[in-house]
Amino acid sequence: MTQTLTQLENSDAFIARHIGPTPEEQQQMLAQIGAADLDTLLARIVPADIQLPAAPPIGAACSEQQALDELRAIAAQNQCYRSFIGMGYYGVQTPPAIQRNMLENPGWYTAYTPYQPEVSQGRLEALLNFQQMTLDLTGLDLASASLLDEATAAAEAMGLARRASRLKQANTFFIAQDVHPQTIDVVCTRAQSCGVEVIIDDARRAADHRDLFGVLLQQVGTQGDLHDYRALMDSLRERGVITCMAADPLALVLLEAPGRQGADVVFGSAQRFGVPMGYGGPHAAFFACREAFKRAMPGRIIGVARDAAGEPALRMAMQTREQHIRREKANSNICTSQVLLANIAGMYAVYHGPQGLRRIAERVHRLADILALGLQQKGVTLRNHCWFDTLTVAVPDKGAVLARALGFGINLRGDLDGAVGISFDECSTRDDLEALFTILLGDGHALDIDTLDTLVQEACEGSIPAALLRREPILTHPVFNRYHSETALMRYMHALERRDLALNQAMIPLGSCTMKLNAAAEMIPITWPEFAALHPFCPPEQAQGYRLLLSQLAEWLVQLTGYDAVCLQPNSGAQGEYAGLLAIRRYHESRGEGQRTRCLIPASAHGTNPASAQMAGMEVEVVACDEQGNIDLHDLRERARQAGERLAAIMVTYPSTHGVYEETIREVCQIVHQYGGQVYLDGANMNAQVGITTPGYIGADVSHLNLHKTFAIPHGGGGPGMGPIGVKAHLAPFVPGHRVVQLAGLTTRQGAVSAAPFGSASILPISWMYIRMMGAEGLRRASTVAILNANYIARRLGAVYPVLYRGKEGYVAHECILDLRPLKARSGISEMDIAKRLIDYGFHAPTMSFPVAGTLMVEPTESENKAELDRFIAAMLAIHDEITRVETGEWPLQDNPLVNAPHTQRELVGEWHHPYGRELAVFPTPQTRENKYWPAVKRLDDVYGDRHLQCSCPPLSDWA
């Protein structure tokens, strides 16, 4: 039969490319689980009262090329002016070798957070390099593996100071008035939520205040002033006040390390180490502190440990500080950080090395010096006495100067009274200097750059006082001194990549993580200069393309969530939780009900939920779950009744973290609303809702959306992420705002939770592309096939690994929990042993012991085809057979392929004294013989790692 032109155009072809199982495979799987078709399957699984009566109106699918063409037209509406705005965001030259081999490489951007260190050694080494870079630049003892952005890091620094302070009666945090305004905004938001008083004043008056537990200073102020705070920090230390300092990594190449000057905590943005501005993000923040504060440190810390063979290996250290273990008692709610961006920044330092970084820093500083000298020769007043890269220039007619600059395609900072700000960066050139002289002085300035350069070099006093110059060397470890050719760097990055297991190698079936395809067409636009090169505070008329993209994406998300408004600012899921809970608090306060601070959270909740509630100033109360894994309605009613007028909210996840669609979810919402509370529906499992139901239709008031789960942004090995929040109309006035940029379409007057007004804006094109190419029907089909895949695995494995929770008709949602406790009781083999043995079979383990200890939670996503599902099923069945051989005594419990897993190449060629063969150890299936993933290390010794904390690069002799 002849096809029509419309059929031949195949505009919905991407749907089949995104969804793994073919229609034929889907029918085979449906037959296996006892359903005639996908609609029948949904009818049996999803409660009828929450199923949408019609598809969300977001339009039809389109082809990859059509979506790219449409997005290219949107991007063309952005205007890429040269930015001299500064304020923590700078032009960069991302080395092409890093862009191609890391930023654009699925081996780097599709991996998950390195909870399984044996399959993450490459990424962990790159993060250790980032930590070493941070330690060298800051002069402190302990560094983390990135935070969300500089402003968030400042808020975390305040939290650390409060936790670690010996001044337990003190409740005031001092902020120097020349800290970046967006940083002040975010810190004040956090302080308000946790009951901390804030003073913003001239830093010289910090010592006058007596009730301080901490102080926030900025080494190079927002207007460019370079400060010597040594005497101030000495006086504060004598009083027990903790000093936190914001710093610029490029400035630190030339300036004395703040830790050596007396700072206790140092943080900043690593953006200018090779990461584009991207209209505000994503960017990695660095964070370092003194050894004494290690237990109060926020975020991930990579530590050097050893494996079962005694070889050096890397892991995430001191995880007992974190939300997935400590819950509401955690140091922070941080889950996703900015791993991919931290790795780019660290690799930038590896590529340039100490000499290359110094050359870049000196050139940037020289350009500022030349401009300053030329202006001073012409009688122009500078408001700076010492500087690194930024000058504040007094001008009689600021509007005219800004307008002239626009004529040259240049943006200057324009929010200063009677002055403009000019910040140089790696991209600044001689031509820019010429243009700036003309803008500020007119065409006939007659200044010669080379002459000015000579005068700057001959000057007796520099713009950086000698006492503030760095004297100690930086980046002395060999890793920063051997990969300066592109060939060497390319091979180093490839060697690291091979040590990791990412989606380009195998399925990553982590429950509650949604490791779906991040399609190439979705990723391509993020490096377009029209998206990558914009400053977040550029004039709004230069960002019309971004504004259009953001408004379209927000409208689509409104339709897909059933809410009335969406705020795109939060740049992680945990930050979205925090923002949503703050909206609830502010709403209650606006109604004169500020006493509503009790937050009910089911026992099965993600660890971020109680951590976020605590951060938002709420008290956490746990609600019981019944034997079927559902919220215990009797317990909920009683706790809601007891809370009464103190009830603020409930945080629920849907489908539940137990992997089922709770039949009573609407009743849960009604109970909470009855007692005056709000319903926060965690969007972690939104991949099982899209196109089928919505949080708003269910009855929730606010949700965050993990765009790095449901909407195809890659996990990046632990970030970036995006966690925008959807809200009902009554909460819309209480979502985050921004003191620098007015958020179009939102009436909020609230403080910011992120440094940039739209969070990590430059990765939002990924979700735009995903939704545009899938369309309403494709998105519904994706959710449905995700449910099909999970049920196929549950049915195939359920006979040997009991599925802990099922719905009333025996089905699961988009993930299933395999109960390993009976096996462990019979054989002694643990969930950890099974997880590590899966590495030998070429798989990343499912989520271990969450939400129930002794289990594995499996989420296959819609992108995995039947062959990959069958490969995973075969691996799990083979592992069960191996457990049986231990159980029957064929293999001793102390020496078998499970407890010894994973097996390395080094082990294969060494002495072999095990009761099982080498082939079974490393090639347990035919597929592993054809495409083998080799772990770089054996199982890690976690106890050793925490007892011997080392978060810096070890000497090369340790790896010999």
UniProtKB/Swiss-Prot annotation:
Q: Name one GO biological process term.
A: glycine decarboxylation via glycine cleavage system
What top-tier enzyme class does this entry carry?
oxidoreductase
Question: Which regions form coiled coils?
Answer: none
Q: Which reaction does it catalyse?
A: N(6)-[(R)-lipoyl]-L-lysyl-[glycine-cleavage complex H protein] + glycine + H(+) = N(6)-[(R)-S(8)-aminomethyldihydrolipoyl]-L-lysyl-[glycine-cleavage complex H protein] + CO2
Q: Name one GO cellular component term.
A: glycine cleavage complex
Keywords, alphabetical: Oxidoreductase, Pyridoxal phosphate
A single Gene Ontology MF term assigned here is: pyridoxal phosphate binding
Enzyme nomenclature, EC number: 1.4.4.2
What the entry lists under CDD domains is as follows: GDC-P
Which cofactors are reported in the record for this sequence? pyridoxal 5'-phosphate
N6-(pyridoxal phosphate)lysine occurs at: 709
Q: What does this protein do?
A: The glycine cleavage system catalyzes the degradation of glycine. The P protein binds the alpha-amino group of glycine through its pyridoxal phosphate cofactor; CO(2) is released and the remaining methylamine moiety is then transferred to the lipoamide cofactor of the H protein.
What family is this protein classified in? Belongs to the GcvP family.
Subunit structure of this chain's protein: The glycine cleavage system is composed of four proteins: P, T, L and H.
> What is the recorded name of this protein?
Glycine dehydrogenase (decarboxylating)
Q: Which organism is it from?
A: Edwardsiella ictaluri (strain 93-146)
